[in-house]
UniProtKB/Swiss-Prot annotation:
It holds the Pfam family tRNA_synt_2f. It is an enzyme of class 6 (ligase). Its main location: cytoplasm. It comes from Coxiella burnetii (strain RSA 331 / Henzerling II). Belongs to the class-II aminoacyl-tRNA synthetase family. NCBIfam families: glyS. HAMAP family: Gly_tRNA_synth_beta. The gene is glyS. This is Glycine--tRNA ligase beta subunit. GO terms for cellular component: cytosol.
């Protein structure tokens, strides 16, 4: 099959740097999807993205669709043939329209009856003719929530478009996209090479931009180039602190990266390092430098988009701004230190947490109580937990956090130390926001989780309590993230807490009556659903999760131990047979539930060795296994129960359960019930079958 390379480039005004890589990935994916939908084969797709362009290069794109067989349906059999099965005019007309004889027509049965149809060989369309619509369709699928219109154009895009390249091989694809006629000309760097550059073939695109236009078109290559340049420049002073989010953003801001090193006044090093780093990152998009001990140095890395004739001027300009911003930060910090965290509590009363749920002051009081409740359950100092909970939100009304919201908790930590609060309280104020996202670090000490869990539980109970649970992909209060944070803290820090009791306590802490009367149950189910999703991500089979869920554990840590025990059980050679046996037992007992009311096992009614063997083995194992249950050693307990495989197999081979003798039947059902109960204390093993 004949193939050619295809190139699309959309040249526009500066694209949002934080979303540039995402847009590039989306464009590449939608074009790939549309080409596959059109049945056009290709070898691979390369994507390019700079502040002024999005581009896609498709290698070895087929120049034509493959020939396809299509079925064209005609009139019903009743209309196509008369009583003598002679073709009617309708049949002849349909055959003629298909270009075949009536003898070549076929009959097909459908839900609506029998119809005649014709198989037609449809030649594939030329790729050149299909591409404009393919690209149009791909562009409509781009995630552009804030698309713009410009001039008198009706088209929308992320930014106003200035040029379009559409090339198939060496040929121009004649089309108008986003209000621009396609051409074979791109543009280089806005300042270093603003003139047009002729692209003679798609495969030359990246090289032409690099050698003629001073543009590194490949986003990943440009990002790694910037990383290397930063590290090299910083090595003369120390080591660069490279924030991956900032690196991604800066990569989206430059086409030809040039690295410069500036410095700021050493006196500002007295500020908390997070303040310095955030100021440099947020205001000037610069990278700090640290020494071998991890201490900040009074230097920073600038990533410029031009090779200036006077780089010193660029450096001085950045230094002036950085020093001014740090002077502001120093002013905010000194001002904040004049008021203790505790004295900021009244000001929290002026900040609404949620209209129906009160102010941040109300929330702080609830966290105080709930953190103390949690501390008592896990044997942590209740007074310290209460103190940390009470002060946890006070830095939100500080000048520094108002200026830099990402420093919430961090500034509270420094202010708490200044106020001579206990070190554990200060750490808890900082760490109670952890984990902030999936995979983030957890709080380090055991006081911090008390506040972290209390804060999240309070939010979940409150928001679900006013009937504002997340729906679909909408989760404005980040309840899913909060639930996952709770679960990770409790499970990974190995903290045993009764989730129902915790949710009830949180509900009772609200001074207002929550409209949702079923809030505790719904909140519990919501958190357990997040637990299910978490295990799914960790590739725990759904059957394992459902088996444990059937035993209704209220403690997430206990739930996790059961999950691990069941997973280990599945590796045992007896697992499949025992799961099948438990399923058989479960089915029998469901049908005979009425005969099981308070029935105890009577050994005198046994009339076979198989019954005695199973009963004796159950009694022997029950005592051992129940002790293991108390220690939450579920893995060993299930391993012990695996030894019941042989007596269970013998029982089902030798004993008829549903005999006519009522006493014997009920006695055997009671024996099976005790077997089921022994397993179900950990999980419903029958669900593994």
């Amino acid at each position: 099959m004949t193939t050619q390379d295809f190139l699309l480039e959309i040249g526009c005004e500066e694209l949002p740097p934080r979303r540039l890589n995402q847009l590039s990935q989306a464009l590449s994916q939608t074009i790939k999807s549309e080409l596959e939908k059109a049945d056009l084969s290709f070898e691979n797709i390369h994507r390019y993205a700079t502040p002024r362009r999005l581009a896609v290069l498709v290698n070895n794109l087929a120049l034509q669709q493959p020939q396809r067989k299509i079925e064209r349906q005609g009139p019903s059999v009743k209309a196509a043939f008369d009583k003598d099965q002679t073709p009617t005019l309708a049949c002849f007309g349909f055959a003629q329209s298909c270009g075949v004889s009536t003898a070549q027509l076929k009959v097909k049965k459908t839900k609506k009856g029998e119809f005649i149809y014709c198989e037609i060989e449809q030649p594939g369309q030329n790729t050149l003719d299909l591409l404009p619509n393919i690209i149009q369709s791909a562009l409509k699928q781009l995630p552009t929530p804030k698309a713009m219109r410009w001039g008198d154009h009706k088209e929308f895009f992320v930014r106003p478009v200035h040029w379009i390249i559409l090339m198939l091989g060496k040929d121009l694809v004649p089309a108008t996209l986003l209000g621009k006629m396609a051409s074979c000309e791109t543009r280089g760097h806005r300042f270093h090479h603003p003139k047009n550059i002729l692209v003679t073939k798609p495969d030359d695109y990246q090289k032409l931009l690099l050698t003629h236009g001073m543009v590194i078109a490949d986003f990943e290559k440009r990002r790694e180039k910037i990383r290397d340049l930063i590290q090299k420049a910083a090595s003369e002073k120390g080591e660069a602190i490279i924030d991956e989010g900032l690196l991604e953003e800066v990569t989206g801001m430059v086409e030809w990266p040039v690295i410069l090193v500036g410095n700021f006044k050493a006196e500002f090093l007295e500020l908390p390092p997070e303040v310095l780093i955030t100021t440099m990152k947020v205001h000037q998009r610069t990278f700090p430098i640290k020494n071998k001990n991890g201490d900040l140095l009074p230097y920073f890395i600038i990533v410029s988009n031009i090779e200036s004739k006077n780089p010193k001027r660029v450096i001085v300009g950045n230094e002036r701004v950085i020093n001014a911003r740090l002077a502001d930060a120093s002013f905010f910090y000194d001002n904040d230190l004049r008021t203790s965290l505790e004295n900021r509590l009244p000001k929290l009363g002026d900040v609404i947490f949620q209209r129906q749920l009160g102010t941040l002051a109300d929330k702080a009081r609830r966290i105080e109580k709930l953190a103390a409740f949690i501390a008592k359950q896990i044997n942590i100092d209740e007074q310290l937990a209460a103190r940390a909970g009470l002060l946890s939100k006070c830095d939100l009304v500080s000048e520094m956090v108002y200026e830099f919201p990402t420093l919430q908790g961090i500034m509270g930590y420094y202010y708490a130390f200044h106020d001579k609060e206990p070190p554990l309280v200060a750490e808890a104020i900082k760490e109670h926001y952890l984990p902030r996202f999936s995979g983030d670090q957890l709080p380090r000490n055991l006081l911090s989780p008390c506040v972290a869990v209390a804060d999240r539980i309070d939010t979940i109970i409150g928001i679900i309590g006013i009937n504002k649970s997340p729906t679909g992909d909408k989760d404005p209060f980040a309840l899913r993230r909060a639930a996952l944070g709770i679960l990770r803290i409790l499970i990974e820090k190995e903290l045993s807490l009764d989730l129902f009791a915790l949710l009830n306590e949180a509900k009772n802490n609200y001074a207002v009556e929550l409209p949702n009367v079923n809030v505790v149950n719904q909140s519990f189910d919501f958190i357990i659903e997040r637990l299910r999703a978490w295990y799914l991500e960790k590739e725990v089979p759904a059957s394992v999760f459902m088996a444990v869920l059937a035993s209704h554990p209220d403690d997430p840590l206990d739930f996790d131990r059961r999950i691990k025990a069941v997973q280990h059980f599945q590796t045992l050679p007896e697992a499949d047979a025992l799961a099948a046996a438990n399923k058989r037992v479960s089915n029998i007992l469901k049908k005979q539930a009425a005969e099981l009311k308070s029935k105890t096992i009577d050994h005198s009614l046994f009339d076979s060795d198989a019954e005695h063997l199973l009963a004796d083995q159950l009694k022997e194992r029950a005592e051992l296994v129940n002790n293991l249950y108390k220690k939450a050693d579920y893995t060993k307990a299930l391993s012990e129960l695996a030894s019941l495989k042989e007596p269970i197999d013998i029982f089902f081979d030798k004993v008829m359960v549903m005999v006519d003798d009522k006493e014997k039947r009920e006695n055997r059902l009671a024996l099976l019930s005790s077997l089921q109960q022994l397993f179900s204390q950990i999980a419903d093993i029958s669900l593994l079958s």
